[in-house]
Amino acid sequence: MLSPKRTRFRKQHRGRMKGIAFRGNRICFGRYALQALEPAWITSRQIEAGRRAMTRNARRGGKIWVRIFPDKPVTLRPTETRMGSGKGSPEYWVAVVKPGRILYEMGGVAENIARKAISIAASKMPIRTQFIISG
């Protein structure tokens, strides 16, 4: 599972996901990519599940790049706890994804294999996505 080695602060505000992604919205490494169409928090488990699905489907050929990283801690309070007494402890990590952001890239395989592998990874994501080709 992906997570930062160390952070400056243990807890973060939730924040807002306004607008579209201006960074990380172009294909940089591979030839095929999976692009987000909706804003969402994507957990490190979902990122890992998508990556595993792609590698399993592409077999030995091809290379995969994960273009998002979960750097935001999400805190949860213990169940059946009364309100107050501070913020909960960090439970898991999420990547903040805006529309237009590239999630995964793939190269070194035929288009039909890439399309199939990326569609399986897309089914693991909690948002609508699209398959795009560079050039």
Swiss-Prot record:
Biological-process GO terms, alphabetical: translation
GO CC term, one of those recorded: ribosome
Coiled coil: none
Superkingdom assignment: Eukaryota
Matches recorded under InterPro entries: Ribosomal_uL16, Ribosomal_uL16_bact-type, Ribosomal_uL16_CS, Ribosomal_uL16_dom, Ribosomal_uL16_sf
Record Pfam families: Ribosomal_L16
UniProt entry tagged with the keyword Acyltransferase: no
Compartments, as annotated in UniProt: Plastid, Chloroplast
Entry keyword set: Chloroplast, Plastid, Ribonucleoprotein, Ribosomal protein
Subunit architecture: Part of the 50S ribosomal subunit.
Assigned protein family: Belongs to the universal ribosomal protein uL16 family.
Name the record gives this protein: Large ribosomal subunit protein uL16c
Organism: Manihot esculenta (Cassava)
